[in-house]
Swiss-Prot record:
It comes from the Eukaryota. This is L-amino-acid oxidase BjussuLAAO-II. It is found in: Secreted. It is an enzyme of class 1 (oxidoreductase). The keyword Secreted applies. Belongs to the flavin monoamine oxidase family. FIG1 subfamily. Catalyzes an oxidative deamination of predominantly hydrophobic and aromatic L-amino acids, thus producing hydrogen peroxide that may contribute to the diverse toxic effects of this enzyme. Shows very high enzymatic activity on L-Met and L-Leu, high activity on L-Ile, L-Phe and L-Tyr and moderate activity on L-His. Exhibits diverse biological activities, such as hemorrhage, hemolysis, edema, apoptosis of vascular endothelial cells or tumor cell lines, and antibacterial, as well as regulation of platelet aggregation. Its enzymatic activities is reduced by the presence of Zn(2+), Al(3+), Cu(2+), Na(+) or Ni(2+) salts. Homodimer; non-covalently linked. Glycosylated. One of its GO terms (cellular component) is extracellular region. Negative results: shows low or absent catalytic activity on L-Arg, L-Glu, L-Val, L-Ala, L-Asp, L-Lys, L-Asn, L-Ser, L-Thr, L-Pro, L-Gln, L-Gly, and L-Cys. It comes from Bothrops jararacussu.
Amino acid sequence: ADDRNPLEECFRETDYEEFLEIARNGLSDTDNPKEGWYANLGPMRLNEFSQENENAWYFIKDPGVLDYPVKPSEVGKHDDIFAYEKRFDEIVGGMDKEVTVTYQTSEKFEPPLPPK
């Protein structure tokens, strides 16, 4: 059986002394001048993001594709439907029940009779 400790094996790397020297003293100066190509060119300039692309996001098109938990009524629907339903509920806010409530309320109270 191999009784060697994996941690001890790390210290037996062929480059261990070189890495230890870099850790103690830092990297040496480069031979190349400080001009020319740099890997870090600052913040990247990304193209404008558009969710209207057919292949943009699977979650938006059908959240069930990625096995996200969805209600049976949500299967196969995309975000536009959910957003529409939410806005509709916010705008309507129970207005569909207003007629019934008004009718029930009017039955409870009798209107005052006009003066004779």
